[in-house]
Amino acid sequence: MSDKGMMVGWSKFGDLGLKFSAAANNSYNFSLIDNSGVDKAAFKFLTFPDKCLISGPSQIYCAVPRNQDVFSRLVFPDDYLKRGVYFQDGIYQIDLAQNKFQTLFQEESPLIDAVNLKISGNRLLFINRYDNRLYSLAIQ
C-alpha cells in the first residue's frame, strides 16, 4: 500500500484496518481494509483512522467531522496532523453486519474533535483535541 496521503489504523487483532487516502481531483477515500490492504467496504463519509475504533469484527465507532466540505479545501492529512484544522465531530456506532449507523453524540456544545477512541466497559473514551481532556460517552 502506497497511496498518497495515506493513514491506516488497525484493529487490535491486526485483521482489519481503516484507511484514509488521497484520490484524484483533491478528493479523498475512507475505507475498511483487510490485513492484505484489500478494500472490504467504502464509507460515504470522510474521517481519519485515529478518530475511529474497530471494536469487533463488525463494530466500528467513529468521530466524523460534520462539515465534510472542509476536505475539499485543505491538504490532508498534513493540515490535520499539524493541527492546522480542528473539526466539530458527531460520534457514531457503525454495525457492518446489520448495516446500521447509530448516532451517539451530535450536540453543538461542547465542541468535540475526538481522537484515540477506546472502550472501557460500557463507555466510549476519547481525547478531545480542543482541550486535550478525556471524555466519555455511554454505549450499549
Give the positions of each predicted feature.
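C-terminal amphipathic "assembly/sorting" segment characterized by alternating charged
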Residues: 116-140
